[in-house]
Amino acid sequence: MAFTPFPPRQPTASARLPLTLMTLDDWALATITGTDSEKYMQGQVTADVSQMTEDQHLLAAHCDAKGKMWSNLRLFRDGDGFAWIERRSVRESQLTELKKYAVFSKVTIAPDDERVLLGVAGFQARAALANLFSELPSKEKQVIREGATTLLWFEHPAERFLIVTDEATANTLTDKLRGEAELNNSQQWLALNIEAGFPVIDAANSGQFIPQATNLQALGGISFKKGCYTGQEMVARAKFRGANKRALWLLAGSASRLPEAGEDLELKMGENWRRTGTVLAAVKLEDGQVVVQVVMNNDMEPDSIFRVRDDMNTLHIEPLPYSLEE
């Protein structure tokens, strides 16, 4: 990517975030084009893409035959096909899996590094962008296209925008916002995704979890009414037979080091500590607080106390901005 990422700053929680423009270099874009693209994606992901309108973007999972996610995808219609955003660390392996059956269909599946991914969030983000685009996405119309640019709207943890655009427009946007917005890298967007309860699947956790273990059913990412797709049987069984015992949790507190993706944590049991869960992502905020996204048993007590392994500091459960009740 010729567009240079912005230098890192310590991320800030959404409630205190000043207007911020971010380069999303830890995320990556991919596309599917061709006459069979809708039919092909319908047979590969958990969401009902045939029902998707031009105005929507969806979180969907791409699973293996056992229902374990290669990755989750932020999916939207793009040209005559679809584009999606996923973690850069999983894109190559995810595309390899997605292409396995493509020889039988009129589709082209490819990474897209020509376009640039930017995030805009924080204080009066909408007002700042309103000067630069003729229309902005909203709850009713979550995707807007203008020239070479696609804008995606997110409600949680506070209103924010993801911009998919060409290098020239990215440079223009940066020049226009540079004076009023702080610049940051993708760690800030990661912190917002953790706060929003959007699961982050990096390479360490690819192929490890069924979608429901990361709350995808609560985020509208699974259709239980659509036709066959890879892994569907296991995903359906988890719902209808109650086979899923895990959920995605948000923890906050202190830690002397950041746990890495794939690492476990420790749960306080009386005087002892027991290993539990799998970390998906963690970020240290500018106020010193550590936020951790972790997959654990779905019956954790709300007052449970956790820690990074062998650490002196502790973490506690924070509420997510959505309900897991079905």
Curated annotation (Swiss-Prot):
Statement: the UniProt record of this protein carries the keyword tRNA processing: yes
Transmembrane segments: none
One Pfam short name: YgfZ_barrel
Assigned keywords, A-Z: Cytoplasm, Folate-binding, tRNA processing
Keyword Transferase (UniProt): no
Location(s) in or outside the cell: Cytoplasm
One BP term from GO: tRNA processing
A GO-annotated cellular component: cytoplasm
Cystine bridges: none
Binding positions (folate): W27, W189
Signal peptide region: none
Family: Belongs to the tRNA-modifying YgfZ family.
Functional note: Folate-binding protein involved in regulating the level of ATP-DnaA and in the modification of some tRNAs. It is probably a key factor in regulatory networks that act via tRNA modification, such as initiation of chromosomal replication.
HAMAP family: tRNA_modifying_YgfZ
PANTHER family listed in its UniProt record: TRANSFERASE CAF17, MITOCHONDRIAL-RELATED
Protein name, UniProt field: tRNA-modifying protein YgfZ
Gene assigned in the entry: ygfZ
